[in-house]
From Swiss-Prot:
Subunit architecture: Interacts with major capsid protein L1. Interacts with E2; this interaction inhibits E2 transcriptional activity but not the DNA replication function E2. Interacts with host GADD45GIP1. Interacts with host HSPA8; this interaction is required for L2 nuclear translocation. Interacts with host importins KPNB2 and KPNB3. Forms a complex with importin alpha2-beta1 heterodimers via interaction with the importin alpha2 adapter. Interacts with host DYNLT1; this interaction is essential for virus intracellular transport during entry.
Entry PTM: Highly phosphorylated.
Positions occupied by motif Nuclear localization signal: 1-10, 511-519
Pfam hit, one: Late_protein_L2
Lineage: Viruses, Monodnaviria, Shotokuvirae, Cossaviricota, Papovaviricetes
Location of this chain's protein in the cell: Virion; Host nucleus; Host early endosome; Host Golgi apparatus
GO molecular function, one term: DNA binding
Keyword vocabulary terms for this entry: Capsid protein, Cytoplasmic inwards viral transport, Disulfide bond, DNA-binding, Host endosome, Host Golgi apparatus, Host nucleus, Host-virus interaction, Late protein, Microtubular inwards viral transport, Phosphoprotein, Viral penetration into host nucleus, Virion, Virus entry into host cell
Cellular component annotations (GO), alphabetically ordered: host cell; host cell endosome; host cell Golgi apparatus; host cell nucleus; viral capsid
Protein name stated in the entry: Minor capsid protein L2
Biological role: Minor protein of the capsid that localizes along the inner surface of the virion, within the central cavities beneath the L1 pentamers. Plays a role in capsid stabilization through interaction with the major capsid protein L1. Once the virion enters the host cell, L2 escorts the genomic DNA into the nucleus by promoting escape from the endosomal compartments and traffic through the host Golgi network.
Cystine bridges: 19-25
BP-aspect Gene Ontology terms: microtubule-dependent intracellular transport of viral material towards nucleus; symbiont entry into host cell; viral penetration into host nucleus
Organism: Human papillomavirus 19
């Protein structure tokens, strides 16, 4: 007798909802839902007598009780204490506005002055530097009468020592005069700082020191080797080593951090490499069997719904139980290849409540490099003087010998055609296989060379009187020297397996054996 299959009942929550109103609920379901079991009563009676809330145990707020959390090794916090302020050892400087320097007003305008400015013709001023007169009064050194300087000598046996007093040098006075002319058309800066370079504003001229005149004495500054600044038209382009693939390289640390917490995390996401090229264009065909829809774009996130009763294995085993397949993401591998990735979500386990549980899967495919083909070695066809020549085949034109006097097509007509009318070309031209050649400044010549389709080899020469062609001869002979055997040698040579002899024996020289037939 077959044993009946045990049917598992529904959860206690669902049974309690339906049987509570009817009053047919089992006791275990009521105790479990209403929390009246023995374990629940022990917790209720025990919590009424013992209170552990101040110790921060179980479901407290985490504030540490009434006293709060106190770090180990430190005293309590003083309430109302004042922090000690340490004065700085250095007195800071007073910050305030700088001294105001009075500015003199140049050419003040009186209230009674007319506001109308008369127009005058300004003569062209010479901006070139002219002769600057420099007046220097140099006073000569006054003459000083010579005086006898006493010389002290000693008579001891030591070395003689001469004590010479230095001559006093009188101070010299040098005076330099300067003359300045006022020009209302320009504003001149008469004082400048001894800096290298010159800067000017619009409608201003800066006159720096040292531009003219004579310098007496040393300049007092050392010459420093200066570097010339390149103009805006001169520039150099340096190739980076190694060549970069982007104008703004990404930091390696940031890229490694993103890669570690992204799709390549093997602890959280399963890594699956896809070899099928359909993954790049139509990844949905790897998950389920379906018809192609050209209006549907595969660049969006796809959701696949599948009933458990009608389970069908996907075309690719790696895409089993995949419910969600994300949009493509492009990245670069450490080896420099382009990677196309899609993040998928599996739905492997399904509970009775309808929740589905599954792992995340990273489907990726690395694109291979496009190898450059080897260059094709081109052969030199010939050298010419520059004149163009076109060689046409025999299919482009046809020559037919026609007698103009005889017209077999016009025999049935009474009207005789004029000989000039026969010169008109009424045929329809077909330019489907033609080539249009547009010449340049040089003259072009067209030559028609017939082409015969024959098995024999032949050479054709094009007559050209305008240019010079260099022809490279080629060996077109196909005949080979035929070696005929000597008449005294046999025509047929038979190789035998006999290794004892050092010659080949002709079959005609062998001894013939008569065949004996036995008759019954």
């Amino acid at each position: 007798m077959a044993r009946a299959r045990r049917t598992k009942r529904d959860s206690a929550t669902n049974i309690y909802r339906t049987c509570k109103q009817a009053g047919t609920c089992p006791p275990d379901v009521i105790n479990k839902v209403e929390q009246t079991t023995i374990a629940d009563k022990i917790l209720q009676y025990g919590s009424a007598g013992v209170f552990f809330g101040g110790l921060g145990i179980s479901t407290g707020k985490g504030t540490g009780g009434a006293t709060g959390y106190v770090p180990l090794g430190e005293g309590p916090v003083r309430v109302g204490g004042t922090a000690t302020v340490i004065r700085p050892s250095l007195v800071p400087d007073t910050i305030g506005p700088s001294d105001i320097i009075p500015v003199d007003t140049l050419n003040p305008v009186e209230p009674t002055t007319s506001s109308i400015v008369p127009l005058t013709e300004a003569s062209g001023s010479d901006l070139l530097p002219g002769e600057v007169e420099t007046i220097a009064e140099v006073h000569p050194t006054p003459s000083i009468p010579s005086t006898d300087t006493p010389v002290t000598t000693t008579s001891s046996g030591a070395s003689a020592v001469l004590e010479v007093a230095p001559e006093p040098v009188p101070p010299s006075r040098v005076r330099v005069t300067r003359t300045q002319y006022h020009n209302p058309s320009f504003q001149i800066l008469t004082e400048s700082t001894p800096t290298q370079g010159e800067s000017s504003l619009a409608d201003h001229i800066l006159v720096t020191s040292g531009s003219g005149g004579q310098t007496i004495g040393s300049s007092g500054s050392d010459l420093i080797e200066l570097q010339e600044f390149p103009t805006r038209y001169s520039f150099e382009i340096e190739e980076p080593t190694p060549p970069r693939q982007s104008s703004t390289p990404i930091q390696r640390l940031r890229t490694a951090f993103r890669r570690r917490g992204g799709l390549t995390n093997r602890r959280l996401v399963q890594q699956v490499a896809v070899d099928d090229p359909i993954f790049l264009t139509q990844p949905s065909r790897l998950v389920s069997f379906q018809f192609d829809n050209p209006a549907f774009e595969e660049e969006v996130t796809q959701i696949f719904e599948q009933d458990l009763d009608n389970f069908r294995e996907p075309p690719n085993r790696d895409f089993l139980d995949v419910q969600t397949l994300g949009r493509p993401q492009y990245s670069e591998t450490p080896s420099g290849y382009i990677r196309v990735s899609r993040l998928g979500q599996r739905r492997t386990i399904r509970t009775r409540s309808g929740a589905q549980i599954g792992s995340q899967v990273h489907f990726y495919r690395d694109l291979s490099t496009i190898d450059s083909e080897d260059p094709i070695e081109l052969q030199l066809l010939g050298q010419h003087s520059g004149d163009a020549s076109i060689v046409q085949g025999n299919t482009e034109s046809t020559f037919i010998n026609i007698n103009i006097d005889e017209n077999p097509l016009a025999e049935d007509y009474s009207i005789t055609a004029n000989s000039e009318d026969l010169l008109l070309d009424e045929a329809q031209e077909d330019f489907s296989g033609s080539q249009l050649v547009v010449g340049g400044r040089r003259s072009t010549s067209t030559y028609t060379v017939p082409q015969f389709e024959t098995t024999r080899s032949g050479s054709y020469y094009t007559q050209d009187t305008k240019g010079y062609y260099v022809a490279y001869p080629e060996d077109r002979s196909t005949s080979k020297d035929i070696i005929y055997p000597m008449p005294d040698l046999p025509v047929v040579i038979i190789h035998t397996y006999d290794t004892s002899g050092d010659f080949y024996l002709h079959p005609s020289l062998r001894k013939r054996f008569k065949r004996k037939r036995k008759y019954l």
